[in-house]
Regions:
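Conserved, mostly hydrophobic/aromatic
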Residues: 3, 31, 35, 43, ...
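Flexible, glycine-rich active-site loops centered on histidine and acidic residues
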Residues: 2-17, 79-141, 185
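Short, acidic/polar
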Residues: 18-30, 163-168, 284-293
């Protein structure tokens, strides 16, 4: 089974955002060496501890310093941008790195502040229309000089989501679908994975490039050599996932010291417990067993791991352990 990585460009204590982007390159190069299929970067705005706000700029930087791995976005938040401009960007990248570009697309409008400053042209209810326009520019209009540069192939498109409009559009347009098992989603992750994979495959219609259905399972994972170490690494993530002040409470990713000094409310503890039920935490054997539960019900074509842990050394070790599963 193909395995891939999604990196958030974490800014660790004592590091700058610029250093965090360079550490993302280190992870991409390691993933390339270890045979991972894809390496994606996220798009986040107004979140100080996450360094990547312009994945379309980071993607060619990563691709030019790696050899075989697919590089892409996980994902570009399309509602902030013109579908025509996104088509131009992706066509340009495909021309520079043919056969290695992915475009993961999300429909999150972000916070009101982000929406205002990016002057979003589309509402969340118009996401299906946005996707249809993008398909037109990447397919029908591709050989008519409407989108330049004109390229022989188009990047693979994958829609990110947790159901709803995203999975319907992915199936209807013949695109890959990435189901994110995210900590702050209330539904049972196992049951949702089962129902979404069934719905996607039963309603899938092959698109203009006749690609088969492709169901990808994306999970937050904290993996270490021992259970005890994994548990310690997960505690800063617990704090982060509280998401206070629109994830701006911490200006760098939380540390062990933050965990020790943070005063948790009862509501915080309840939220942490709820989030933990959707995280994969443990040593390699424990992580494998937890992943098997999700795989058994959804039969994914690919796995996309999100190793959201502090320190580049621990992220690298996580990647090495994931490659061995």
């Amino acid at each position: 089974m193909k395995i891939s990585l999604l990196d958030y460009g974490l800014v660790d204590e004592g590091k700058t955002s610029a250093e965090a982007v360079r550490e993302t390159l280190e992870l991409a190069q390691l993933a390339d060496e270890l045979g991972f299929h894809r390496f994606w970067v996220s798009e986040h705005h107004n979140v100080p501890a996450l360094s990547i706000s312009a994945p379309e700029v980071v993607i060619p930087y990563l691709a030019s310093h790696t050899k075989n791995i697919h590089i892409g976005s996980g994902g570009i938040m399309g509602l902030h941008y013109s579908p025509y401009k996104v088509a131009e960007i992706m066509s340009t990248l495909e021309g520079l790195f043919p056969g290695r570009m992915d475009i993961g697309l999300g429909n999150s409008p972000g916070t009101p502040l982000v929406g205002r400053n990016l002057q979003s042209l589309y509402s969340k209810e118009q996401y299906a229309l946005w996707l249809e326009k993008l398909q037109h520019y990447l397919n029908e209009a591709r050989h008519k000089g409407v989108v330049v540069p004109e390229v022989a192939t188009v990047p693979e498109q994958l829609l990110l989501g947790m159901g709803g409009q995203s999975i319907e559009s992915a199936a209807t347009l013949g695109l890959s679908f990435v189901y994110g098992v995210f900590p702050y989603i209330p539904q049972d992750p196992v049951e949702l994975a089962k129902s979404l994979s069934k719905k996607y495959r039963s309603t899938f219609k092959s698109g203009p490039h006749s690609k088969p259905s492709n169901f990808v399972l994306a999970v937050f994972v904290v993996i270490a050599d021992t259970s005890e170490e994994a548990e310690e690494m997960a505690k800063p993530l617990d704090l982060w996932m509280l998401g206070k002040q629109d994830f701006s409470e911490f200006h760098t990713f939380p540390t062990r010291k933050d965990v020790e000094t943070y005063e948790l409310t009862q509501r915080d503890r309840e939220k942490i417990a709820s989030n933990r039920s959707r995280l994969i935490v443990g040593n390699p054997r424990e992580v494998f067993e937890q992943m098997e539960t999700l795989r058994a019900v959804s039969n994914p074509d690919e796995l996309l791991f999100i190793p959201l842990v502090g320190s580049i050394e621990k992220r690298k070790r996580s990647v090495e352990l994931l490659a061995e599963l």
